[in-house]
Amino acid sequence: MAVTGWLESLRAAEKTALLQDGRRKVHYLFPNGKEMAEEYDEKTNELLVRKWRVKSALGALGQWQIEVGEPALPGAGSLGPELITESNANPIFVRKDTKMSFQWRIRNLPYPKDVYNVFVDQKERCVVVRTTNKKYYKKFSIPDLERYQLPLDESLLSFAHANSTLIISYQKPKEVLVAESELQKELKKVKTAHSSDGDCKTQ
């Protein structure tokens, strides 16, 4: 089963864990050289950040690509392309999951709720957002469902609008909830260093 396949690849990855600033940071190194880093709230186990990095054909490390969480703020760490700020007036697309849902926030969208049309495009396996006034259009996939090879179900999709922010939620299928619970059990086995311990060692 595909869900098991992704879970097994997470189990097989080399993992290091670090507790810092109320966050449990987990780094995964997969056999193919791909890296994934996740940050969880230490108290709630809620996923705050997930990002990926792959090596180029020449073996150089690429930039981290953020899948979940806020992009790094200017001045935080070394300067890089990911620190170029967007205009405050442009719509800003950020994924922030909850325990029970995948969730996306699109800021700087001032139009009333009835202007938005949010639906699943089954052919392209993505979620589409469009406005009846043709001011905004976006489509995005849900990588988690791709990894678990689960279908998109429009009945699990909902959206709300408040404070110029469109909030799109996709209820996590039970297969994903079970897999995430299994992963948390797995992560408890990883020796966790504390930020005062220096570099954490790979398990």
Curated annotation (Swiss-Prot):
It holds the Pfam family DPCD. One of its GO terms (biological process) is lateral ventricle development. It comes from the Eukaryota. One of its GO terms (cellular component) is extracellular region. Belongs to the DPCD family. PANTHER family: PROTEIN DPCD (PTHR31921:SF1). May play a role in the formation or function of ciliated cells. This is Protein DPCD. It comes from Bos taurus.
